């Protein structure tokens, strides 16, 4: 606070003196170059009067500032801080209505235990297609569909699903073997034809 008042005094004094110098410079430019000694002495007297007025203004400002600073210090000393222990968050009415037990952890399989599941359209098409192409695995498909209706599908482990998938695609495995044999025989036939062509050209 003291620094602020001191800066205010210096700024005020600087502005006041600078303004006086600017006015005196402008007046000196407008006045004639010739002047009497009496006029110079009168000017010095005016300057002395102005300096006295400036000193009085500065003293008055200083006294007012000191009174204000003293009152500020007194007010600061009179302040009393009461130690209050407040809760971090006040409990609102909406927070009181929230029941924590509403979001209890449940068994992930319990909600599907007693529900009946029906296959989707795509699943039903796959089942029908598999029945037509694999009559031997129709019983397995029926068992699987019945299990899916009364139990959760996620209970089956991946190995069991893989085994069921392999059982349903027996013909696909045979077809893969047949295509592999066909590819090998075709490759062998192409090799024989190339050798025959080579022999024919060499005999000529």
From Swiss-Prot:
Keywords: DNA-binding, Homeobox, Nucleus
Residue spans of biased composition, Acidic residues class: 36-56
Region (Disordered): 15-63
Organism: Schistosoma mansoni (Blood fluke)
Protein name stated in the entry: Homeobox protein SMOX-6
Gene name per UniProt: SMOX-6
Record feature DNA-binding region, as residue ranges: 1-15
UniProt entry tagged with the keyword Nucleus: yes
GO cellular component terms given for this protein: nucleus
């Amino acid at each position: 606070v003291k620094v602020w008042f001191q800066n205010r005094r210096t700024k005020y004094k600087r502005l006041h003196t600078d303004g006086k110098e600017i006015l005196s410079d402008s007046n000196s430019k407008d006045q004639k170059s010739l002047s009497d000694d009496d006029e110079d002495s009168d000017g010095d007297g005016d300057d002395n009067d102005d300096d006295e007025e400036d000193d009085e203004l500065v003293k008055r400002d200083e006294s007012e500032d000191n009174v204000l600073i003293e009152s500020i210090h007194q007010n600061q000393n009179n302040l009393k801080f009461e130690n209050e222990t407040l809760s971090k968050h006040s409990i609102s009415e909406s927070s009181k209505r929230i029941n924590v037990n509403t979001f209890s952890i449940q068994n992930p399989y319990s909600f599907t235990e007693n529900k009946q599941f029906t296959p989707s359209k795509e699943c039903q098409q796959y089942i029908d297609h598999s029945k037509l192409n694999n009559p031997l695995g129709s019983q397995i498909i029926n068992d699987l569909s019945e299990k899916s209706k009364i139990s959760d599908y996620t209970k089956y482990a991946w190995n069991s699903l893989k085994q069921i998938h392999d059982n349903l695609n027996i013909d696909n495995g045979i077809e893969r073997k047949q295509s592999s044999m066909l590819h090998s025989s075709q490759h062998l036939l192409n090799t024989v034809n190339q050798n025959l062509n080579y022999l024919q050209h060499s005999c000529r």
